[in-house]
């Protein structure tokens, strides 16, 4: 498995301050704003509970149903949804003309005042030697501190698109939750099953409570979802109403975007948000995390 990204300065500071070793992730992704005390529309916290609103959103590199690139529109959808942690799929980073070579992950983080980590599943040479690398993948936005992160490349046969599993340990008012974000292969069940198998292995190693966000490109009755829900709970089944279709945005007919959690996380409400900002609709879920610094053990 790939190593975690952990800046040395943060470790040294922690050792000097505490004279001990913290046996977990001890870093954050690049901050893009201070952690707020609260947010309008976010779930209300009561004593002993740690509510967390999360969302999964395939943003189609900012191109909406009108075929127009409009990243501000994506930002407004996220903002209006009130999610404190958001998993984004199909995110460009200096990728090309289709997204005007913008680092979309950083742009959205700065626009929303959130922290961000980005997982590059495609990492291509620039068109000119002095330009940034052209990248495409997934991102996690968070209003809470990100203490560490990594991106794992998933199985890919020859000729297939490289997919990945981005994960971040997020500190939510003293509790840690491990947030995963993925986007599985769209045209091969065999590939998705192989990718799900590796995801289950990685998720199963988590000491913390787990939230898996993503465009899984599989419907609820599929073998892929049957496999992953042996380990994680489908929050739409627990807290959603209706079919929960997320694709496509113009004529929703399939539920392929998910929020899945470990059994110690409670889903209180789930909704699909109407939007024309992408070809997918975002799914937003209110969760309650368990107490304790590290969640499950």
How should each PLM-predicted stretch be described?
Residues 43-54, 134, 138, 142-147, ...:
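Beta-strand-turn-beta hairpins that frame and shape the catalytic cleft
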């Amino acid at each position: 498995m790939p190593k975690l990204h952990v800046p040395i300065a943060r470790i040294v500071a922690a050792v000097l301050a505490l004279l001990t070793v913290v046996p977990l992730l001890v870093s954050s992704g690049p901050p893009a704003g201070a952690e707020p005390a609260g947010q309008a529309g976010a779930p209300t916290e009561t004593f002993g509970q740690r509510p967390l609103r999360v969302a999964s959103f395939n943003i189609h590199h900012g191109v909406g149903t009108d075929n127009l690139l409009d990243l501000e529109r994506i930002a407004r959808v996220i903002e209006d949804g009130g999610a404190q942690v958001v998993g984004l799929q199909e995110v460009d980073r200096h990728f090309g003309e289709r997204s005007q070579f913008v680092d979309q992950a950083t742009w959205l983080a700065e626009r929303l005042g959130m922290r961000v980590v980005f997982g590059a599943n495609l990492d291509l040479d620039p068109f000119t030697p002095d330009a940034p690398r052209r990248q495409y993948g997934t991102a996690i936005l968070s209003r809470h501190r990100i203490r560490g992160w990594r991106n794992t490349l998933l199985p890919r046969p020859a000729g297939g698109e490289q997919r990945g599993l981005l994960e971040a340990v997020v500190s939510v008012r003293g509790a840690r939750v491990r947030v995963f974000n993925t986007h599985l292969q769209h045209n091969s069940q065999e590939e998705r099953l192989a990718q799900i198998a590796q995801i289950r292995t990685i998720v199963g190693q988590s000491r913390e409570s787990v939230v898996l966000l993503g465009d899984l490109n599989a419907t609820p009755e599929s073998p892929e979802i049957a496999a992953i829900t042996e380990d994680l709970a489908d929050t739409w089944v627990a807290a959603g109403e209706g079919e929960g279709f997320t694709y496509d945005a113009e004529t929703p007919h399939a539920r392929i975007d998910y929020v899945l959690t470990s059994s110690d996380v409670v889903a209180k409400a789930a909704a699909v948000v109407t939007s024309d900002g992408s070809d997918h609709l975002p799914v937003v879920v209110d969760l309650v995390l368990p107490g304790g610094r590290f969640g499950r053990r």
